[in-house]
Amino acid sequence: MSDDEEYTSSEEEEVVEETREETKPPQTPAEGEGDPEFIKRQDQKRSDLDDQLKEYITEWRKQRSKEEDELKKLKEKQAKRKVTRAEEEQKMAQRKKEEEERRVREAEEKKQREIEEKRMRLEEAEKKRQAMLQAMKDKDKKGPNFTIAKKDAGVLGLSSAAMERNKTKEQLEEEKKISLSFRIKPLAIEGFGEAKLREKAQELWELIVKLETEKYDLEERQKRQDYDLKELKERQKQQLRHKALKKGLDPEALTGKYPPKIQVASKYERRVDTRSYDDKKKLFEGGWDEISKDSNEKIWNEKKEQYTGRQKSKLPKWFGERPGKKAGEPETPEGEEDAKADEDIVEDDEEVEEEVVEEEDEEAEEDEEEEEEEEEEEEEEEEEEEEEEEEEEEEEE
């Protein structure tokens, strides 16, 4: 509720009368108007309604006073908050102003310091320039206007370019200051009007543009020269590597800090065979045959050991007599394999001892084996024919 909403006692009485009129019961036919009990009940109802209305009005007044108190407190808090916010904003503005003043003061002090340092440097450079001019004036004016650079034995035989490269940072800075003192002229703008100042500013602007253009051109030229220098160095390194490889040296032998050693003998006359004369003589007298024989024997023994030490395949055992088994042959394929291995070993030993005899024996054995194989084939064919005849007879029966 707002503060403008106020009720007077007359308005409250009107509200009470209206509620009473509304709460009046409808008039019924005068059936029991003369009944005292009925009248008493009606009066009791009216008194109860009046009491309820009074209680409602008192409660409403209490609630309204409570709301007015809360609203008043809220307005007081709002007013206090506005005051504190205004004070805080004022303090913040004051703080910002002080910070800005301090920053401006520090910038002015820094600028003043830089100007003072620059002035001192210029004064020192001017003093040095005056001293140099005075020294030049003191020289003999009748002498030549050029100087001949002579090699000084006390400077380790360095040329002028080498001395220029070996200058320290302080020396270069000093020379830069002196050259700038000659090149930078003071501005004489006292008593100039606006038009002359504009002309002077335009002239200085054109000079700045010209100097920046020259600076950019020189930087680009330096970049190209650095690239060309790197390319030439790499090309020289590759040529030195090829040269070292042709001479039979290490590829990096000629690209190091120090030059390679001088070759005093031809690379084609180097001694590779360090054996003595007696050793070479023995080789030509038959020692080479012995060496080759020993090496062949060694190779043969290694192969023999490899063959005997191989892993043998184990076949499943055969129960019963093998088909095609002859008298004197082993019962199982494993025994036959072992027998064959023993025969091969014996044959190899015989071949090492007597090659010619072994060849003849092998041929005879091959012939015998072929004959045996032929006989076995014939027997198998006969057995097959007999089986076929038996099958035919059975079919006929």
Swiss-Prot record:
GO terms for cellular component: striated muscle thin filament; troponin complex. The keyword Acetylation does not apply. GO terms for molecular function: calcium ion binding; tropomyosin binding. Transmembrane segments: none annotated. Gene3D superfamilies: 1.20.5.350. Some glutamate residues are polyglycylated by TTLL3B. This modification occurs exclusively on glutamate residues and results in polyglycine chains on the gamma-carboxyl group. It comes from the Eukaryota. The keyword Cell wall biogenesis/degradation does not apply. Isoform 3 is expressed in the hypoderm. Isoform 8 is expressed in the dorsal vessel. Isoform 6 is expressed in adult TDT muscle and isoform 9 in adult IFM, flight and jump muscles. Residues 1-16, 331-397 have a biased composition (Acidic residues). Keywords: Muscle protein. Pfam families: Troponin. Residues 37-77, 84-129, 136-148, 294-307, 319-329 have a biased composition (Basic and acidic residues). Troponin T is the tropomyosin-binding subunit of troponin, the thin filament regulatory complex which confers calcium-sensitivity to striated muscle actomyosin ATPase activity. This is Troponin T, skeletal muscle. It comes from Drosophila melanogaster. The lineage of its organism: Eukaryota, Metazoa, Ecdysozoa, Arthropoda, Hexapoda. The gene is up.
